């Protein structure tokens, strides 16, 4: 409750009744990290990165970039190395573009989303559960 409340105050959002979705990531594939905004069903994204410092992060591979627009991974406002318990929280919106340079390998993160409380969110959570289930068998 304290985390939810702090995020709600920080971003001026009402999150009291927002469902949550939790995602555990251990690896990224070549296609991961493409420039995108999150689904409109996701109101807030919380990322906790659990990786040790390595040379890959120093070369900016796999470091999340909060972008100024959809067209250029190099046009970023902030770059966040996914290391040492770094916590990143951002509200979703039509201009919250983000992504990272291609990185294939271990990239551990816990992602918590505060979701919209409607049909879009329920659909997104069903899709998420199905995706998580299939990844167990396909790696």
What are these regions (language model features)?
Residues 1:
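A short, highly charged nucleic-acid-interacting micro-segment common to nuclease
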Residues 128-139:
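Low-complexity, Gly/Ser/Thr/Pro-rich intrinsically disordered linker/tail segments
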Residues 4-129:
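Catalytic core of non-heme Fe(II) oxygenases with the double-stranded beta-helix
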